[in-house]
Amino acid sequence: MPVVAVIDYEMGNLHSVCKGLEKAGATPIITHCHQELTKADAVILPGVGAFDPAVQSLRSRDLEQPIKDTIASGKPFLGICLGLQILFESSAEGNQPGLGIIKGKVRRFVWEPGITIPHMGWNQLELTQPKSILWEHLPPQPWVYFVHSYYVDPFEPQVRAATVTHGTQTVTAAIAHENLMAVQFHPEKSSNIGLQILSNFVSQVREKIAA
């Protein structure tokens, strides 16, 4: 089975991500060791919490460069929730620079009548890259589970793989560019749809190994 390294920097619900990967047919290893990232067939960067502590935690474990090297190598990489946001250059939530792997900023939802912040619960995706491997075998507007007050705003709109609408605000819900994929929602909390997304990621890992 493909080995997927799940980065542990004390900012994620790693157990449920790992359970989802096991159901998807992968062997997850929880690690903050860059040698393990190098050996793994793919890497996942999960994350819940605040932007500044997350990037500080990654940097204190000397994980910034290994993450950049992993993505540059062409190895399949998936960011989840905060693990999407810290790939960007900066966030309205904090003062620390992000990893800057994707050009753009993290912005906060603007309050408007009839919505709650954080955006929490089930919502439908609008697939802007419908042919992305992440969305294989999914219905056209799948329901997934969100918990976030901030969203990513990529400088290059073509990296968007899906959007979501909260109130009148339509924002990026996922990005995909070559081997780099990341989602704002929680696939591990998104029932069968989320499991299919993780399975699609693992399928891509298998294809990469076979090649």
Curated annotation (Swiss-Prot):
Main location: cytoplasm
Description of how the protein assembles with itself and partners: Heterodimer of HisH and HisF.
Enzyme Commission code(s) on record: 4.3.2.10, 3.5.1.2
Domain Glutamine amidotransferase type-1 as annotated: residue spans: 3-211
Claim: Cytoplasm is one of the keywords in the record: yes
This protein's GO CC annotations: cytoplasm
Keyword tags: Amino-acid biosynthesis, Cytoplasm, Glutamine amidotransferase, Histidine biosynthesis, Hydrolase, Lyase
Keyword Endoplasmic reticulum appears in the UniProt entry: no
Any GO molecular function: lyase activity
Protein name: Imidazole glycerol phosphate synthase subunit HisH
Cellular compartments annotated: Cytoplasm
Active site: 81, 186, 188
Pathway this chain belongs to: Amino-acid biosynthesis; L-histidine biosynthesis; L-histidine from 5-phospho-alpha-D-ribose 1-diphosphate: step 5/9
HAMAP family: HisH
